[in-house]
């Protein structure tokens, strides 16, 4: 796609305007809770760029008509979506994975100011790395960065076609209202329990209710299922069947996992065993795919290495400043020696380069796999030190995730002719907003991580994964429960095969195989979540087949609204509970 020439567009006299920045920060603060909420529920988040663009242009169109405000231009909206998406992606800095995992393993809990500073430091490192990679990856090599392309096309459409913009915004807001209203009614007025399916599996001791096979009235899961696609949805269903329909009952029958109450859901009892094969499947597939991706893009990585040989003075100063910040904060909060933090920053730069390139070519950011690389590295460098293992991986994974998100935003800006340095400023302000809002929401949602996480209410699958890897690297194979070793071996073979197939087979064939990350997640979330996610994916696929034009135009907006409505009300209810 060719770059747009700013001189050809008289639509936006300003770019980095006060209203663009403030709008982005406010929307970022409002949308960040959605990703924190969904991250703790199912371990996934979604890009908020398009939602932020729609909401901003809708708000300023109203201000234009009612208050006489000047038109909100496309480049202004680009600054807005850059700040908002960077704020909402703050969960990659550890809020739904290594930070709660550290609490579960060591009891370490951080107050809001300290947690916000840590999350900001990790994320701003990713912003600095992205600033150094932009010219090579976007201008010289013109990597795709699919999310950035999609956002650019959306911005062009909504600023070029007023009716379509208004219709998509109304669809987004209507879905948000329905989802949020249902959540409010179910929590405050009418208690509608999950509809447990009757009966049991053939020859199985637990009932379907014990295994969590039920229909859940959650529109958030339906919406998220629509966003992740049919392949991931069906993979979740397959993973749920293997975990809760086969391995769970088998582990109970062999005495490897305890049975719960006869009329209850056995999630907490079974997940402590099931997470091991699930984590193995996810980690092995992710690392296999990651290694093959690196081999595929090795020429481009060599170009980045040559580029890094001569850092400009200003950029070198920024990188040194961020490194010093991380060393001070990591030492103060977690007792990490300076050399450990410096090594983590150096590793972050290398892995963020890889993450940005893989994301640029495939649209997938391998944050989880990169975190595991660091955990394995520090398992050797600092054996037995759980804080070092988790928080250095937090640095690399968080920096890589924020870097990749920034590259997609910079791709959007390049296409529409925006100034990259202004986007970098917007990204930094968004990170600040996300750090303050995201940490506050996290602390309100789970004030007692040890008692609330890895439960049916808050499954926190990413926490389970990071915690399990840290336990094995710290305590050795003795941390693995009885009988799980054989299941892990089978999962490792499957993960190796699926991870390799995902990178080596033609795309049309790879899409027909299960998604290992999705199947692995199903091992550590309740079965009813997997069923709802699959249902959402099937509904979206059917709609796309029957009404392709309508689905393309409104599908993402409706699905995003379903996710946003329930999660925002869920966060609001948590604040209400805290306030008494």
Residue ranges and their predicted role:
Residues 1-580:
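Alpha-helical multipass membrane-protein architecture
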């Amino acid at each position: 796609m060719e770059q747009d020439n700013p001189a050809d567009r008289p639509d936006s006299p300003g770019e980095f305007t006060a209203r663009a920045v403030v709008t982005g920060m406010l929307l970022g603060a409002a949308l960040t809770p959605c990703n924190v909420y969904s991250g703790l529920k199912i371990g996934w988040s979604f890009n908020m760029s398009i939602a932020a663009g729609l909401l901003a242009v809708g708000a300023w169109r109203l201000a234009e008509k009612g208050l006489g405000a000047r038109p909100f231009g496309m480049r202004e909206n680009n600054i807005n979506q850059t700040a908002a998406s960077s704020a909402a992606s703050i969960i990659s800095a550890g809020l739904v994975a290594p930070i709660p995992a550290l609490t579960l393993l060591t009891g370490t809990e951080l107050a809001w100011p300290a947690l916000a500073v840590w999350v900001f430091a990790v994320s701003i490192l990713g912003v600095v790395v992205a600033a150094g990679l932009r010219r090579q990856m976007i201008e010289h090599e013109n990597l795709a960065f699919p999310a950035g392309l999609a956002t650019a096309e959306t911005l062009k459409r909504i600023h070029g076609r007023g009716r379509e913009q208004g219709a998509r915004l109304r669809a987004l807001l209507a879905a948000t209202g329905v989802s949020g209203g249902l959540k409010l009614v179910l929590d405050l007025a009418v208690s509608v329990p999950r509809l447990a399916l009757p009966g049991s599996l053939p020859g199985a001791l637990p009932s379907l209710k014990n295994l969590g096979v039920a229909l859940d009235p959650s529109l958030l899961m339906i919406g998220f299922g629509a966003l992740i696609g049919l392949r991931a949805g069906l993979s979740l269903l397959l993973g749920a069947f293997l975990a809760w329909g086969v391995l769970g009952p088998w582990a109970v029958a062999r005495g490897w996992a305890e049975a719960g109450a006869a009329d209850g859901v056995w999630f907490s009892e079974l997940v402590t065993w099931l997470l091991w094969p699930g984590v193995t499947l996810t980690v092995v597939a992710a690392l296999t795919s990651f290694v093959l991706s690196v081999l595929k893009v090795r020429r481009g990585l060599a170009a980045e290495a040559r580029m890094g040989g001569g850092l400009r003075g200003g950029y070198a100063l920024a990188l040194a400043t961020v490194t010093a910040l991380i060393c001070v904060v990591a030492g103060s909060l977690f007792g990490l020696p300076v050399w450990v933090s410096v090594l983590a920053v150096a590793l972050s730069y290398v892995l963020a380069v890889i993450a940005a390139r893989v994301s640029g070519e495939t649209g997938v950011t391998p944050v989880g796999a990169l975190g595991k690389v660091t955990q394995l590295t520090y398992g050797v460098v600092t054996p037995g030190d759980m804080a070092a293992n988790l928080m250095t991986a937090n640095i690399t994974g968080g920096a890589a995730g924020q870097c990749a998100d920034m590259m997609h935003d910079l791709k959007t800006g390049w296409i529409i002719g925006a100034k990259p340095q202004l986007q970098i400023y917007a990204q930094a302000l968004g990170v600040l907003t996300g750090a303050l809002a995201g940490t506050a929401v996290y602390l309100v949602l789970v004030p007692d991580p040890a008692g609330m996480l890895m439960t049916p209410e808050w499954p926190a699958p990413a926490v389970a994964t990071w915690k399990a890897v840290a336990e094995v690297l710290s305590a050795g194979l003795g941390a693995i429960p009885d009988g799980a070793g054989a299941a892990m071996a089978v999962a490792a073979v499957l993960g190796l095969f699926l991870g390799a197939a995902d990178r080596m087979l033609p795309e049309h064939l790879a899409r027909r195989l299960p998604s290992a990350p999705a199947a692995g997640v199903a091992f550590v979330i309740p079965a009813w979540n997997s069923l709802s996610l699959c249902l959402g994916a099937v509904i979206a696929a059917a709609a796309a087949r029957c009404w392709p034009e309508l689905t393309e135009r409104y599908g993402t907006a409706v699905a995003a609204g379903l996710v946003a409505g329930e999660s925002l009300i869920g966060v609001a209810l948590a604040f209400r509970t805290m306030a008494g």
